[in-house]
Amino acid sequence: MEGRRSALGTDPPMIIEQPAPVGRRRLVVTIVLTVAVAAITNGALAALGFNPPNSQIWPAFAPPGATIGIVWIVLFAGMGAALALAADRRAVVVLILMCLAYPFYTHLFSNHLTELVGNVFTLAYAVWLALRVRFQSPLAAIFIACVAAWIVFATVLVLALARLNGWRI
């Protein structure tokens, strides 16, 4: 069966870059590596005492800290899968690095404005990346969209914390 032909009789150029076929081994290795990096980062943060202040009033919808850590591990597994599935791997690595930096700009500065700005930039990048890779790998786009959804939740949580405890700027 022949492909579509243009007026010149040649196939039109492909605009969408397609990723190379993904083997199970590469998929598993990238997932394991990203989860390991996230787990090591979470462990280091816990060992260094990077915990939110206990004096804050938390909104009723805030999940326990352990749940947040588990969700991030699952999200990093999804980003690892997206890294293996998407053709634009550098862009996925940038998202992974932005998410690894998340605890540092949220807790290190203890500043609601910094948290919001970081969330907005990370959210905008995640949405852009999901839209960019959606034709390369719809599954990778779904994994990245899950990160964006969680960042929306985190942003709502930051706004609620600021409202309940006063803005720290």
Description of each model-found segment:
Residues 2-24:
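Short, Lys/Arg-rich, polar N-terminal cytosolic tail immediately upstream
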Residues 16-45:
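N-terminal signal-anchor transmembrane alpha helix
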Residues 35-43, 95-105, 148-156:
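Aromatic-anchored segments of alpha-helical transmembrane domains
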Residues 48-61, 166-169:
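Membrane-interface helix termini and inter-helical loops of multi-pass transporters
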Residues 58-71:
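Short aromatic-rich membrane-water interface segments that cap or initiate transmembrane helices
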Residues 72-83, 94-100, 122-123:
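Core segments of transmembrane alpha-helices
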Residues 104-116, 135, 164:
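Membrane-interface helix caps and helix-loop-helix hairpins in membrane proteins
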Residues 156-169:
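Juxtamembrane boundary at the C-terminal end of a transmembrane helix
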